[in-house]
A protein has these predicted regions:
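Short, solvent-exposed turn/loop segments enriched in Gly/Ser/Thr/Pro and often Arg
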Residues: 32-40, 44-46, 96, 119, ...
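Active-site rim elements
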Residues: 1-5, 63-73, 86-91, 117-118, ...
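Structured segments of extracytoplasmic/periplasmic soluble domains
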Residues: 18, 22, 85-86, 103, ...
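C-terminal cap/loop subdomain of S1 sulfatases and analogous C-terminal strand-loop tails that border
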Residues: 38-40, 80, 87-176, 214, ...
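Long, internal low-complexity/basic segments
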Residues: 53, 166-175, 180-185, 190-250
Length: 250
């Protein structure tokens, strides 16, 4: 991980140097982000923060606010409308995201009250959705495979270690509520605890409303509906790069 950070720093530095050398540094909007968390178990291709919390670094050439770390909630669907506002471009009516361009001039500008994320499949079918607020997260799985979906985890020594220490038998929480203020690592599912039932209902309503507003639906589960071009593993497949015919939905 630290080597990846070092490589990013070195190569991003080359881009900054080139912009300065060509005289475009002070008229260029600069942004760096990533698509998901690290490719380890319980990170990439999960809805834990370790999977959906990604880097986002932006520089507006003429900001009032600069060089600060902002802790508000932002979704990547907010990036396109933000770029439009910063560059003075008319936004498309179909954008679902909310521009956070005003943050560059006002640190106290309101950010997203909640953000949403989803999984359908990486190499195998695993429909899941989540809603995250500042203090809570609700994760819902909509499939019927209750074990950890190993084929959606990239192969690595870390994955091998987890498989040798019980991950093959471990079941995931199909419905989970996390108190992020007190449990930032999402280790304790409080969905059954009495004092969290009001929070659960609130988060459930937010997620259901979002799904209705966006026309969200899980991908078809029946095997005859898969596109022929898709490579779709069986849920119990361990290796995402398996070449065994029985590991695939034909």
């Amino acid at each position: 991980h630290m080597r990846s950070v070092e490589m990013f720093d070195q190569n991003f530095g080359k881009i900054i140097h080139m912009l300065k050398e060509t005289g475009h540094y002070d008229d260029t909007l600069i942004m760096f982000t990533t698509d998901h968390g690290v490719p380890y178990p319980f990170a990439k291709c999960t809805l834990f923060d370790s999977g959906i919390h990604v880097a986002l670094i932006m520089r507006d050439p003429k900001p009032i606010v600069k060089g600060v770390h902002i802790k508000g909630l932002v979704s990547q669907i907010d990036v396109a409308p933000t770029i439009c506002d910063l560059l003075g471009i008319e936004k498309d009516d179909g954008y679902q995201g909310k521009s956070f361009a005003k943050v560059f001039s006002n640190l106290h500008e309101e950010m997203d009250e909640a953000v949403f994320a989803e999984i359908n499949f990486h190499t195998s079918y695993e429909p899941a959705r989540c809603v995250r607020t500042k203090d809570y997260k609700l994760i819902c799985y909509y499939g019927d495979y209750e074990k950890i979906n190993r084929s959606n985890i990239d192969n690595s020594p870390t994955k091998q270690y987890y498989m040798e220490h019980g991950m093959l038998d471990k079941e995931k929480c199909m419905l989970a509520l996390y108190d992020l203020a007190n449990d930032p690592l999402e280790q304790h599912n409080v969905i059954q605890e009495k004092e969290y039932q009001e929070v659960y209902q609130m988060m459930k309503q937010k997620l259901e409303t979002w799904r209705k507003e966006t026309g969200d639906m899980a991908l078809p589960l029946t095997e005859d509906k898969w596109e022929k071009a898709w490579q779709v593993n069986q849920p119990a497949c361990i290796d995402p790069k398996s070449k065994r015919e029985e590991d695939f939905i034909q």
